[in-house]
């Protein structure tokens, strides 16, 4: 039984196959690959983009979607994770997409399920489909020529599952990664590090990936105000100037904190393209896992 818990669960050949499939799905036409199949989504953390994206992907493949309301589920009444897994499995879904505030929950569920489990984000640990769609966006923009491209990841890197998954995946595809964050947002890493964003860093980047400040994962106040943070790390036109690059963000964007209003409307900012690509990538992932499991 295969699952997608981290980006390491797919090798490079499989990822390129996913990209080829996802490219076909960008036409947004409905398919019947998963007709008669049932996909359950259970998100223990709030989500708009990821949940909607997975559900759109499932429906475009012809699958039925069962969204479990966590606020009314038995887990909110004290049911153990193992009992939750057993009950989910008894419903015989063809796949489960799960998000949880605690790292490791999707892996625990996967050990007790008889269907593929897809990690929709767990704590600070991983968000594999986000990293896949980010690389897919980069891959398409540079027409497959991604090796050696310089990417600057800016923001709350230490607390970001998006950063963790991207660092693993982009390293495997030989992108040149630089991290920019204040000291308390910087993980222990061998990668190049800077503690303030400046023009020279941007001038030497092909891609900038801005990240949201994960205030819900902070144990204490680390900035007097987000405006103080923005002074050093907001992506602004005055910094980017006319540099030929692309700007990514996993969403939701804190405007004028992560990225300025002016840059959000700039043609180099591909946030909405990431959203479109995300549905296609998740279609490819669901199709692969479900059909391989039944094959």
From Swiss-Prot:
Q: Which reaction does it catalyse?
A: carbamoyl phosphate + L-aspartate = N-carbamoyl-L-aspartate + phosphate + H(+)
Q: What pathway or pathways are given for this protein in its record?
A: Pyrimidine metabolism; UMP biosynthesis via de novo pathway; (S)-dihydroorotate from bicarbonate: step 2/3
Annotated TM spans = none
Enzyme Commission number(s): 2.1.3.2
Binding residues for L-aspartate: 77, 161, 212
Query: Is ATP-binding among the key words of this record?
Result: no
Report the Pfam families cross-referenced here: OTCace, OTCace_N
Question: Organism's domain of life?
Answer: Bacteria
| MF (Gene Ontology) | amino acid binding; aspartate carbamoyltransferase activity
Tell me the SUPFAM superfamilies matching this sequence: Aspartate/ornithine carbamoyltransferase
Q: Which PROSITE patterns match?
A: CARBAMOYLTRANSFERASE
Q: Name one GO biological process term.
A: 'de novo' UMP biosynthetic process
Q: Hey, which family's this protein in?
A: Belongs to the aspartate/ornithine carbamoyltransferase superfamily. ATCase family.
Per UniProt, subunit arrangement is: Heterododecamer (2C3:3R2) of six catalytic PyrB chains organized as two trimers (C3), and six regulatory PyrI chains organized as three dimers (R2).
Please describe what this protein does. Answer: Catalyzes the condensation of carbamoyl phosphate and aspartate to form carbamoyl aspartate and inorganic phosphate, the committed step in the de novo pyrimidine nucleotide biosynthesis pathway.
Mind telling me what this protein is named? Aspartate carbamoyltransferase catalytic subunit
- Which organism is this entry from? Campylobacter jejuni subsp. jejuni serotype O:2 (strain ATCC 700819 / NCTC 11168)
The organism's taxonomy opens as: Bacteria, Pseudomonadati, Campylobacterota, Epsilonproteobacteria, Campylobacterales
